[in-house]
């Protein structure tokens, strides 16, 4: 039997008993209690270099940075192997995979039995959210992957201090992770152990996460999507708060007024770029600061305002497409102490990925560790960087404020070649929830005259809601109604809700809106709408700006171009609203009646409008 040997700084009997229980099941060769120290980090990095999991990069160009190359079969989240095992199938809903918890436990017990043989079990304590914040939650991950242990040190507040907050009886979310490849005595390990059979399992009632077979990102760093979205969304519903797939940014105008915005976009729609936006020419005196680029936990305050924290402490960003033009702040964040995964590397130890530079460097080794061949991808399309958020030059002074930052507006956006205008403001909270619930994003780049397939991704939470999506909509509606009463009593208002679409195309299939820093122009209008300063025109689908309502200083973007990305085609909108029925039917009878009513009213308004 493996000796548990809990260190003195762990004073939580229930936690120690749980570690012992999992050790008896998984049978690791030894147990290490992580303390989050620099010495421990370096020791684990050196261990992985010796194992061939990691390589040291050029320390002049990339100080303190390392590269890991995963197994080619283990490169992304596995949505089809991700389960929400609630007691009742209906509580998981139609958009999640479900299995009876008793059946799943039996299955996983078989898989986890002896799964850590020959390996070290790392006990990784972490806080999602600033230590001690009333919005934060603690997790403990038991993993046999040193890659997970070092990555969690960057992605969460990881180490000894977590045990001080936990004390002798504090609550924690138990997370168990194994790569699922036990080692027999004397057997040589592979550089990236993983198992073809994978399970990422959540038990919402008992707040447990079990992950088997993958060493990669969101499947293995269990504080990220598993805890911070799937389990936290269940907690939020029970306790009256929100766990959302949203960036948080701060906007300060030249007069010193500051607003915080939370924005939800599906993957590959530019969340990180938007969170780290640099205002363009013509916006001197404006400042954008980053609180978070991926996840927001939002709790109502006594004053009826919604306060958000970024539960993470790092960025786990997609590398391809990131460069000094698209995201200079992100590139500056990567100046040191980065763990790269599945990017390419030059013969002198510098990283490279598609979009980093126009020229492909000579003598490149691709993400599979082979010489790069032109015409193939050098970096995997989902190649990642893991880096501490505190290194970001645009990081907000209040990014670790335990009370959170007050949200003035929510933005929802997807990738649509037509139909959806550049920006629109919802009529009210219910209308905003309807728009977020029915938002869609194209899965394929739209060819000329051919629309990409629109996948509905409600609130950009389709892969991440830990319970029935219809109940999730209901939670947003109820929270709005409750908070609205408090807000009115304190002289505050609910955040306004906006929809954006940076991706409208012209007849030739080209993007019309320049995006990136130019999105500041839309952001300014949104802020001014929150302040009651900006004009808008009422249309059947929401309030929209005219060309004159936006600030065009420093750009030559024409009224004709603006009209192209803001026009509302009546037939397209009738088709669009009618297509929402497919999602609503899928979600079944728990769908809030208010959303069905909103759909009928919208459809009628659009049909009555002149084109």
Swiss-Prot record:
PROSITE patterns: PEPCK_GTP. Keywords: Cytoplasm, Decarboxylase, Gluconeogenesis, GTP-binding, Lyase, Manganese, Metal-binding, Nucleotide-binding. GO terms for cellular component: cytosol. GO terms for biological process: cellular response to glucose stimulus; gluconeogenesis; glycerol biosynthetic process from pyruvate; oxaloacetate metabolic process; propionate catabolic process; response to lipid; response to starvation. Its EC number is 4.1.1.32. It is found in: Cytoplasm. Its cofactor is Mn(2+). Mn(2+) binds at residues 225, 245, 294. The active site is at residue 269. Pathway: Carbohydrate biosynthesis; gluconeogenesis. It catalyses: oxaloacetate + GTP = phosphoenolpyruvate + GDP + CO2. GTP binds at residues 268-273, 384, 415, 516-519. Binds 1 Mn(2+) ion per subunit. The keyword Ribonucleoprotein does not apply. Substrate binds at residues 77, 216-218, 267, 382-384. It is an enzyme of class 4 (lyase). Transmembrane segments: none annotated. PANTHER family: PHOSPHOENOLPYRUVATE CARBOXYKINASE, PHOSPHOENOLPYRUVATE CARBOXYKINASE [GTP]-RELATED. Monomer. HAMAP family: PEPCK_GTP (MF_00452). Belongs to the phosphoenolpyruvate carboxykinase [GTP] family. This is Phosphoenolpyruvate carboxykinase [GTP]. It comes from Acinetobacter baumannii (strain ATCC 17978 / DSM 105126 / CIP 53.77 / LMG 1025 / NCDC KC755 / 5377). The gene is pckG.
């Amino acid at each position: 039997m493996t000796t548990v040997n809990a260190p003195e700084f762990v004073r939580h009997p229930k936690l120690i008993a749980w570690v012992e229980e999992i050790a008896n099941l998984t049978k690791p060769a030894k147990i290490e209690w992580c303390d989050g120290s620099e010495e421990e980090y370096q020791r684990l990095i050196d261990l992985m270099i010796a194992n061939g999991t990691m390589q040291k990069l050029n320390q002049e160009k990339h100080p303190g940075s390392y590269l890991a190359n995963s197994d080619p079969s283990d490169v992304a989240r596995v949505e089809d192997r991700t389960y929400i095992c609630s007691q009742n199938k209906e509580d998981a809903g139609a958009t999640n995979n479900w299995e009876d918890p008793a059946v799943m436990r039996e299955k996983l017990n078989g898989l986890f039995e002896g799964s850590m043989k020959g390996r070290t079990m790392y006990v990784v304590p972490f806080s999602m959210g600033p230590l001690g914040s009333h919005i934060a939650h603690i997790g403990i991950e038991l993993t046999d992957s040193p890659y997970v242990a070092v990555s969690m040190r960057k992605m969460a507040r990881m180490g000894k201090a977590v045990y001080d907050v936990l004390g002798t009886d504090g609550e924690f979310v138990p997370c168990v992770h194994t790569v699922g490849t036990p080692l027999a005595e004397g057997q040589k390990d592979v550089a990236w152990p993983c198992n073809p059979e994978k399970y990422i399992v959540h038990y919402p009632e008992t707040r447990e996460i079990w992950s088997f077979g993958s060493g990669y990102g969101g499947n293995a760093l269990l504080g990220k999507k598993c805890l911070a979205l799937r389990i936290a969304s269940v907690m939020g519903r029970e306790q009256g708060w929100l766990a959302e797939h949203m960036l948080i940014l701060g906007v300060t105008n030249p007069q010193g007024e500051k607003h915080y915005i939370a924005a939800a976009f599906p993957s590959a729609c530019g969340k990180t770029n938007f969170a780290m936006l640099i205002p363009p020419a013509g916006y001197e005196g404006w400042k954008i600061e980053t609180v978070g680029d991926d996840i927001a936990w939002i709790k109502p305050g006594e004053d009826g305002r919604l306060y958000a924290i970024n539960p993470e402490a790092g960025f786990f960003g997609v590398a391809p497409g990131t460069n000094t033009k698209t995201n200079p702040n992100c590139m500056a964040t990567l100046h040191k102490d980065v763990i790269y995964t599945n990017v390419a590397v030059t013969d002198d130890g510098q990283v490279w990925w598609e979009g980093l530079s126009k020229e492909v460097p000579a003598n490149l080794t691709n993400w599979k560790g082979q010489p790069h061949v032109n015409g193939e991808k050098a970096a995997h399309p989902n190649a990642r960087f893991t880096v501490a958020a505190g290194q970001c030059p645009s990081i907000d002074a209040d990014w670790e404020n335990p009370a959170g930052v007050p949200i003035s507006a929510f933005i929802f956006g997807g990738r649509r070649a037509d139909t959806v205008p550049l920006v629109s403001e919802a009529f009210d909270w219910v209308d905003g929830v309807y728009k977020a619930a029915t938002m869609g994003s194209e899965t394929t780049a739209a060819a000329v005259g051919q629309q990409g397939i629109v996948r509905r991704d409600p609130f950009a939470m389709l892969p991440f809601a830990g319970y029935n999506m219809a109940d999730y909509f209901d939670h947003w509606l109820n929270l709005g109604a409750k908070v609205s009463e408090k807000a009115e009593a304190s002289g505050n208002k609910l955040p306004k809700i906006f929809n954006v679409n940076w991706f409208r195309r012209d007849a030739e299939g080209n993007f019309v809106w320049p995006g990136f820093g130019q999105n500041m122009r839309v952001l300014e209008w949104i802020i001014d709408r929150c302040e009651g300063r900006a004009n808008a025109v009422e249309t059947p689908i929401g309030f929209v700006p005219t060309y004159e309502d936006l600030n065009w200083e420093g750009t030559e973007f024409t009224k004709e171009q603006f009209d192209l990305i803001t026009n509302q085609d009546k037939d397209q909108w009738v088709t669009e609203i009618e297509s929402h029925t497919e999602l609503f039917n899928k979600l079944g009878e728990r769908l809030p009646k208010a959303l069905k009513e909103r759909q009928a009213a919208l459809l009628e308004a659009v049909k009555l409008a002149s084109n």
